[in-house]
Every structure is written in C-alpha cells, then in structure tokens.
C-alpha cells in the first residue's frame, strides 16, 4: 500500500492518505514535545520506538477483544490504521496520583487511588486542552450520553488489560491517556497511540520513570528509557 497525500501533521505523527479511502498511513516522528508543545526537541530514534511499542500494545489489545484502529506495522517508523472520525477528547485513566492530578488536589505522587478515576480533557490547542466534565461534553456536542457511557466502559476495559500486561513486565501503570474514534457505522474504537508518550510507567521495584516524564521533567535521556519498555514488551511476547 502506497503513501499518498499528507492529510495531517501532529506533534509526533504525520498522517497520509493511501489508495484505500478507509486506510491511513501513519509516520511516527523523531520529535519529543511536552507542556502542550511549548517544549519541543528532535530526538533520533524516538519515532521508531513509539511505532513499535504502539504496534505491540494495539496487537495485544486486539487479542483481548478491545477494538482499535490498528491494522499493521509496515516499516520502522510507519503503520497502517483504519480511518475514523476522532472525538476531540483526551480520556485519562488514573490508578495512582501523579502529575496535574497531584498538583490540583495536593495528593502525594504515587498515592494509590481506591478505584481508577476517569478524567476528560477537551482537545483544543487554543484553550490548552481544558479539563471538562460530562455535562460540558454534552453541551459541546462532542459525544452523546450513550457514547460517554461506552467510552468510560472502554477506558476501564483498556485499563484492566494494560495493567495486567505491564504488571507482567514489572511495570506499574500509574495513569494513561487515550483517544477514541468513531467509524462510519458509529462504532467507537481506541485510536491514536499507546506508548511511553501517553502513559506514566514506573518500575515496580525502583519507581524509576519509564515514560515521557523523563523528558518533561529533564530527568535524563528518553531513548534508553523507551528502549527498556520495548525490550520488556518483546520479552513478554
């Protein structure tokens, strides 16, 4: 399948048309960003790592009967995905307090939450992706009440599958964010990516950060950290 016209450029990916209108080519970029794009650097090797990590995780989730847009990895930096209408929400699932959650509620990082907490953020760069609730979502006509219920159920299903997977890798899934797409048949699918860019991952024994916080907080180089996550995934498969 050939790469055709560029249709979208994001912070860390480019999307291209293919000869099949229902399929897109995704190119993962050697780009690291944080703070809604305010911090940005070229990082050689990062694109290939995120492409491979996301491919492995999406394949695993498909085996767990969790619907997603992934078709296949086609090169070091590229994969094919199903075309969906993206719902402009970031859905965050938190198992432990960390990041903005800890700051907002003055809860120490690493505090285990009694049950997973789901948060919604409106994907709008001009507004810095604000935290919103279900009433806002309905007012903005971003999703229907029935879709909100389905999105929350899907998010918890993904959380369970990912938590079990990372537990086997000696990694604690602190929190993660996902995006959801809508097919022409109005089926909701997991879309975008799941990688150390979108998850907080701590080593179970040392609490070492194995995610983008290493870049965000300037704790070190992210490529060796992402390579460690990939190697653990490959060992598990």
Curated annotation (Swiss-Prot):
InterPro entries hit by this protein: SAICAR_synt/ADE2_N (IPR028923), SAICAR_synt_PurC (IPR033934), SAICAR_synth (IPR001636), SAICAR_synthetase (IPR050089), SAICAR_synthetase_CS (IPR018236)
Gene Ontology BP, a term: cobalamin biosynthetic process
CDD domains: SAICAR_synt_PurC
Catalytic activity: 5-amino-1-(5-phospho-D-ribosyl)imidazole-4-carboxylate + L-aspartate + ATP = (2S)-2-[5-amino-1-(5-phospho-beta-D-ribosyl)imidazole-4-carboxamido]succinate + ADP + phosphate + 2 H(+)
Top-level lineage group: Bacteria
Pfam families xref list: SAICAR_synt (PF01259)
Pathway(s) where this gene product acts: Purine metabolism; IMP biosynthesis via de novo pathway; 5-amino-1-(5-phospho-D-ribosyl)imidazole-4-carboxamide from 5-amino-1-(5-phospho-D-ribosyl)imidazole-4-carboxylate: step 1/2
Keywords annotated in UniProt: ATP-binding, Ligase, Nucleotide-binding, Purine biosynthesis
UniProt keyword annotation of ATP-binding present: yes
EC number: 6.3.2.6
GO molecular function, one term: ATP binding
HAMAP family associated with the record: SAICAR_synth (MF_00137)
Family: Belongs to the SAICAR synthetase family.
Name of the protein this chain belongs to: Phosphoribosylaminoimidazole-succinocarboxamide synthase
Source organism of this protein record: Enterococcus faecalis (strain ATCC 700802 / V583)
Gene that this sequence comes from: purC
């Amino acid at each position: 399948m050939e790469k055709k016209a560029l249709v979208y450029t994001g912070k860390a990916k480019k999307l291209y048309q293919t000869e099949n209108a229902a399929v897109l080519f995704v190119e993962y970029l050697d780009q690291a960003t944080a703070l809604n794009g305010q911090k940005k650097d070229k990082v050689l090797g990062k694109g290939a790592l995120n492409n491979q990590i996301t491919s492995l995780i999406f394949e695993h989730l498909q085996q767990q009967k969790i619907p997603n847009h992934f078709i296949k990895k086609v090169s070091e930096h590229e994969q094919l995905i199903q075309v969906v209408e993206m719902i402009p929400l970031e859905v965050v699932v938190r198992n432990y307090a960390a990041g903005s959650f800890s700051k907002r509620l003055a809860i120490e990082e690493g505090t285990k939450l009694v049950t997973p907490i789901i948060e919604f953020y409106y994907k709008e760069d001009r507004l810095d992706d604000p935290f919103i609730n279900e009433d806002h979502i309905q007012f903005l006509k971003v999703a229907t009440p029935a879709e909100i219920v389905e999105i929350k159920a899907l998010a918890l299903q993904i959380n369970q599958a990912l938590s079990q997977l990372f537990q086997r890798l000696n990694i604690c899934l602190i929190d993660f964010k996902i995006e959801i797409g809508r097919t022409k048949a109005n089926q909701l699918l997991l879309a975008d990516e799941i990688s150390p860019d979108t998850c907080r991952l701590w080593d179970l024994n040392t609490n070492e950060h194995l995610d983008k916080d290493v870049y965000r907080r300037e704790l070190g180089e992210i490529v060796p950290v992402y390579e460690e996550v990939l190697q653990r995934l490959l060992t598990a498969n």
